Amino acid sequence: MKILVDENMPYARDLFSRLGEVTAVPGRPIPVAQLADADALMVRSVTKVNESLLAGKPIKFVGTATAGTDHVDEAWLKQAGIGFSAAPGCNAIAVVEYVFSSLLMLAERDGFSLHERTVGIVGVGNVGRRLQARLEALGIKTLLCDPPRADRGDEGDFRSLDELVQRADILTFHTPLFKDGPYKTLHLADEKLIRSLKPGAILINACRGAVVDNTALLTCLNEGQKLSVVLDVWEGEPELNVELLTKVDIGTPHIAGYTLEGKARGTTQVFEAYSKFIGHKQHVALDTLLPAPEFGRITLHGPLDQPTLKRLVHLVYDVRRDDAPLRKVAGIPGEFDKLRKNYLERREWSSLYVICDDASAASLLCKLGFNAVHHPAR
């Protein structure tokens, strides 16, 4: 049994070698010749999986180690009788922590408290729900918009997108990309929406590039609209609008979900799905794969305020480490993908063990996802 795995899927070689012969291949462009005798294909979001790639090939199963699936033609796979699995929620924590790192940087730079801001969350799936929970744990007001979930009657106080635009100081997008249909998200943030944002608002896109109309956004920024922008995703990736990059406050190369934990979850989820598919069901404990974190433990004295939280968050991950490299190489062919391929190891907040002498600080840090304990001062 021959299994092709994306070369940037951590732990894929070791795990899938339990099931067959493993060959690691680049995801963009994928070497088509390798598909001629392969039984399974494990990809990431950079690989377009469709009829033109797989027609006439012996592939029986496709797994994507990503939460999003808009790069996969699921309907064609089903029609062709090819098994499929994604990894829903695998990088949700990573994306939430990316948003926090960005907001805390902007708050420090511009001198505001997040408690004074209302955050509008567009898309309340695995990422949006976790973001809501962490923001509300800090006492920060949130507004939720998710028309599909509202129409299904899912639990939640869902508001219209127009209301979020009118009331939110921070608008952050966490939707799939739907190019048509009743819940179309292509250019959901169009010129009209962008112009309607509150003066000084913060716009964040960490889902799919085309959810925000990049041309319209650049037009508004060039005309002097007072707006802070965080973009991790871009229309036309791996190409991007270099002029737009110069105008945004934070720009990164589609790495919001790139924690080691998130990548490992993606790999293990598709490994478990494929092992079940072939009748050799296996389970992998994530903590048996992950290395020891760079910072083993830290002691925190006193309560948790915003400056202290910012220091803890940026100790684990400071978004500026990914902004600067992109600006240096933007526009150079191949460099966007190279930044992603050679991405520095990044951990989640849970990797940091925090000893607190304040019980409320320990409790709050646990709610935020840190590994915190209360040890009273002696």
UniProtKB/Swiss-Prot annotation:
Q: Which SUPFAM superfamilies match?
A: Formate/glycerate dehydrogenase catalytic domain-like, NAD(P)-binding Rossmann-fold domains
Give residues annotated as binding substrate: S45, T66, Y258
Q: Which Pfam families match?
A: 2-Hacid_dh, 2-Hacid_dh_C, DUF3410
Query: NCBIfam families of this UniProt entry?
Result: PRK00257.1, PRK15438.1
Which EC class is the enzyme in? oxidoreductase
Q: Please list the residues that make up the active site.
A: R208, E237, H254
* Taxonomic source organism: Shigella dysenteriae serotype 1 (strain Sd197)
Enumerate the subcellular locations listed in this protein's record, separating them with semicolons.
Answer: Cytoplasm
Q: What function does the entry list?
A: Catalyzes the oxidation of erythronate-4-phosphate to 3-hydroxy-2-oxo-4-phosphonooxybutanoate.
Q: What is this protein called?
A: Erythronate-4-phosphate dehydrogenase
Please give the InterPro entries that the UniProt record associates with this protein: D-isomer_2_OHA_DH_cat_dom (IPR006139), D-isomer_DH_CS (IPR029753), D-isomer_DH_CS1 (IPR029752), D-isomer_DH_NAD-bd (IPR006140), Erythronate-4-P_DHase (IPR020921), Erythronate-4-P_DHase_dimer (IPR024531), NAD(P)-bd_dom_sf (IPR036291), PdxB_dimer_sf (IPR038251)
